[in-house]
Amino acid sequence: MAIHLVIIDALNLIRRVHSAQPDPTDIANTIQNTCRTLQRIISESHPTHIVAVFDHLGSDRGWRAEILPEYKQGRKPMPEPLLNGLEKIQDAWWQLGIDSLLSEGDEADDLVATLACKVAQHGEKVTIISTDKGYCQLLSPTLQIRDYFQHRWLDQPFIEQEFGVKPQQLSDYWGLTGISSSQVTGIPGIGPKAAKEILSQFDDIEQAFLSPDLPKKYRTKFDQHIELARRCKRVSALKTDIELGFNLQDLRFTANETH
């Protein structure tokens, strides 16, 4: 039987469902609505294996903040009623046949990336359910990203239209432009248009920096800020080598079995 692993970016989904509610303290409604959303996702995607990956919620901002101290600094905390209701949400998802994987010190996106790439590299189909465009750098013939809320695939044509670069250049793109929502600055004075121009001429930041053909209008910026660009690229890239401690069989979708 062909394998299809569906990975739910859990907090990405939960926050969007919760923010649309009129009463943010009504966690029972959040549970009901997230379960309804997941049932539709399952109905549309027909997974053989499925898992929901959650961020750890400690004060440690992880390895990225060690490289770039301002990374995600000052980000709004999760609303307390929602934070207190996460365990109940996970229990409800378990009843649907969806187990939860909680990251411990690693960001959820690195866990998602590692799991997705390990399975996709064996030629099996993987779908990541998330609105996070950061996952687009993982795209491959067997790995796809679905933005459920916008009813669209974050695929190669989407990346071309949105960023004008190849999937494998996205971390370089963000190394140049930054990611404002995560306090990743990039090179001051280089925006999307300039990054697209640079990465249409060069494969990556290093090739551009070392080339005598880098346009003069960018040379001073690169010379002054190359180390910052390298750090921004590193924090924008997803890790795909985390030790997982389980195998694919543990994620088999068992909706019709008793939990």
From Swiss-Prot:
Its EC number is 3.1.-.-. InterPro entries: 5-3_exonucl_a-hlix_arch_N (IPR020046), 5-3_exonuclease (IPR002421), 5-3_exonuclease_C_sf (IPR036279), DNA_polI_H3TH (IPR020045), FEN (IPR038969), HhH2 (IPR008918), PIN-like_dom_sf (IPR029060), Xni (IPR022895). Residues 165-255 form the 5'-3' exonuclease domain. It comes from Vibrio vulnificus (strain YJ016). The gene is xni. Residues 189-194 are annotated as: Interaction with DNA. K(+) binds at L176, I187, I190. Its cofactor is Mg(2+); K(+). Mg(2+) binds at D109. This is Flap endonuclease Xni. Gene3D superfamilies: 5' to 3' exonuclease, C-terminal subdomain, 5'-nuclease. Pfam families: 5_3_exonuc (PF01367), 5_3_exonuc_N (PF02739). It is an enzyme of class 3 (hydrolase).
